[in-house]
Amino acid sequence: MAYNTGRYLKMAARQLTKNFDQFARQYDLTSTQMAIIDYLGRRTAAQILQRDIEQEFNIRRSTATLILQRMERKGLLQRFVAHHDARQKMVQLTAKGQELITLISQYMASQQADLEQHFGTTRIREFEEVLQYYLNLEGDQH
């Protein structure tokens, strides 16, 4: 049987998203919203711009705007004009969003611990090299 790593990777990513969505749903979140809260929670000292979120999650400005607007409506974060550049939006968790940081980070840590227990850190690091290869591909590179 021929292996197709890209296909397996895509299937695994879908399954991982389904699992994250299932966890996030109990807090009226999507997996993407959960990931953004986790990202903002880990960068507490930094001033986060919408542009930083776009780069971190490899999404377009319009997609980021839509996601962040929905999170604003839910009272999870607020966006405001950056002090140093009026064209940029700063993003900050509200108290409601901050309440979810611990739950989300514990969930993410437990997922990582399960992975490490099952495969060991060496195999995970090797797999991360494969993932990094895919992340660095651009366009029609072979």
Regions flagged by a language model, labelled:
Residues 69-129:
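Charged, amphipathic alpha-helical coiled-coil/dimerization segments
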Residues 1-27:
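N-terminal leader segment of winged-helix/HTH proteins
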Residues 22, 70, 133:
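Alpha-helical DNA-recognition elements
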Residues 18-60:
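N-terminal helix-turn-helix DNA-binding core of bacterial DNA-binding proteins
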Residues 50, 68-69:
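Short, hydrophobic-biased segments on the C-terminal half of alpha helices
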Residues 9-12, 16-19, 57, 100, ...:
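Alpha-helical linker/hinge and terminal dimerization helices associated
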